[in-house]
Regions:
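Long, low-hydrophobicity, solvent-exposed regions enriched in small/turn-prone and acidic residues
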Residues: 1-202
């Protein structure tokens, strides 16, 4: 099955809230470019998705493609490509590839990983690796992460890679003491919510 959507905004007047004191060409345009979203679940396990956005002059502003496989035993494998064009004073360019996985290893244990490679600068922008244990009553996750912030220029002499160790404890029925890790995985791993719900409810 295939799902597709397209959208475009039209304005009746110039924007009153701007990034700078003086409106630029984007603040006075009467419409945006189109945005297109397409996804297809090829079978019970395999899904692909693509998104693209254009500016009103027809230039492509950004696009991405992702594919993920969800297994029947709680495993997930994900690859994707993301491109964003440089728009002065609006957005910086990037050209990146991502991959992630969730793999059960034994009983209630599973390992998870995510990597984000910067094609422009030929370096690993982010990688994350961790382990998760989940029982009927509680769950714990511990992860190590090495990354640059989205706005960091890794070639700048004063910019250094950041490193962190994160932990999350969840008591079933009470929620998590720290939900930042779950939010991070939701944003990084396509299909995480789907596979995580089936894992916790098994």
């Amino acid at each position: 099955r295939i799902k597709a959507s397209i959208g475009q905004s039209y304005y009746f007047s110039d924007r009153r809230v701007t990034l700078n004191q003086q409106p630029d060409e984007f603040d006075t345009q009467n419409r945006t470019g189109p945005i297109v979203n397409i996804s297809s679940q090829l079978n019970q396990n395999f899904t692909i998705a693509a998104n693209s956005a254009w500016m009103s002059n027809g230039d492509n502003a950004q696009r991405d493609f992702q594919a993920y496989y969800v297994g029947n035993k709680g495993n997930l494998y994900n690859v994707g490509y993301f491109y964003r064009n440089n728009i002065p004073d609006r957005q910086s360019s990037y050209d990146q590839a991502v991959a992630s996985f969730i793999q059960p290893v034994k009983d209630n244990w599973r390992i998870m990983g995510h990597a984000q490679y910067d094609l422009d600068n030929s370096l690993m922008r982010e990688y994350l690796l961790g382990v998760n244990y989940e029982s009927c009553c509680w769950a714990v996750s511990v992860y190590g992460r090495s990354y640059y912030n989205d706005l960091d220029d890794p070639n700048a002499p004063d910019v250094h890679r950041k490193r962190a160790v994160m932990a999350e404890l969840t008591l079933k029925g009470l929620g998590a003491f720290n939900n930042k890790l779950a939010s991070l995985l939701e944003n990084r791993v396509l299909g995480f919510n789907k596979i995580n719900q089936s894992w916790t409810q098994r």
